[in-house]
Amino acid sequence: MKVAVIGAAGGIGQALALLLKNRLPAGSDLALYDIAPVTPGVAADLSHIPTPVSIKGYCGEDPTPALEGADVVLISAGVARKPGMDRSDLFNINAGIVKSLAEKIAVTCPKACIGIITNPVNTTVAIAAEVLKKAGVYDKNKLFGVTTLDVIRSETFVAELKGKNPGEICVPVIGGHSGVTILPLLSQVEGVEFTAEEVAALTPRIQNAGTEVVEAKAGGGSATLSMGQAACRFGLSLVKALSGEKGVVECAYVEGNGEHARFFAQPILLGKNGVEEIQHYGELSTFEQDALDSMLDTLKADIKIGEEFIK
């Protein structure tokens, strides 16, 4: 199984590469690519970690050698948020990066599962889909917006609030991956009850957690380490499912049946071909239903920006 990390010299990419070097199954191949000349050095550094995962690093203008034969491609390339920016401010730079990478993937490894981390995810996933579609290789079961960070934040914050072990908390998060489009389904957390006040406080905290980190880093970056952890969790789940493991479920932003929007995050059963089944997320509370209804216009507008960028 070959996993390619694209944008591997960045804050997320290096953290993700470190975690994958430690946690991929024995015999896996890990390829790192970034435009930055330091990338082969990052691979050399990680190659000294004694795990049975082979690693190679590539730099320069062309990601092709890293993409060749890849089963999973995780894209974290692009610029990060600075204080005062929201995820949509990143669009002007990151849209072009995702477009050119998707064009390379379409030629080099069109059957790979692609996890997009590069923000704004609501929009960049639509860009990748349109590029792959134009190339005649789009498989909606193999393109994912990685929203796992919203899930791990939800698990962490719920566990903190309720004095529980975060490993025992499961919070489905639906919608998109920015601001109001992030909807944690707190009504569905098993074994935990919330007051209306707790839900009203916790929901925006989860939605704005990225901004919390951007401000705390005071211009020195965005959420790179927690995002690396989230991307690793999603990447490992994909690898397990592609290897034939059953019952692997993660929330992700995918093209489904279009019930709410063309792309929508919800729990996904992963399988040997990517998305095996889009699971229904169950009954919503009144608070959640209202939040869902009021965010859909924002989500649809984000998607449209991506589609129109390619047309």
UniProtKB/Swiss-Prot annotation:
Listed GO biological process terms: malate metabolic process; tricarboxylic acid cycle
The keyword Ion transport is annotated on this UniProt entry: no
CDD domains linked to this entry: MDH_glyoxysomal_mitochondrial
Pfam families referenced in this protein's UniProt entry, alphabetically: Ldh_1_C, Ldh_1_N
Keywords attached to this entry: NAD, Oxidoreductase, Tricarboxylic acid cycle
Cited InterPro entries: L-lactate/malate_DH, Lactate/malate_DH_C, Lactate/malate_DH_N, Lactate_DH/Glyco_Ohase_4_C, Malate_DH_AS, Malate_DH_type1, Malate_DH_type1_bac, NAD(P)-bd_dom_sf
Active site (UniProt): 177 (proton acceptor)
NCBIfam families membership: MDH_euk_gproteo
Function: Catalyzes the reversible oxidation of malate to oxaloacetate.
Record's subunit section: Homodimer.
Protein name: Malate dehydrogenase
Naturally occurring in which organism (per UniProt): Aliivibrio salmonicida (strain LFI1238) (Vibrio salmonicida (strain LFI1238))
Species classification: Bacteria, Pseudomonadati, Pseudomonadota, Gammaproteobacteria, Vibrionales
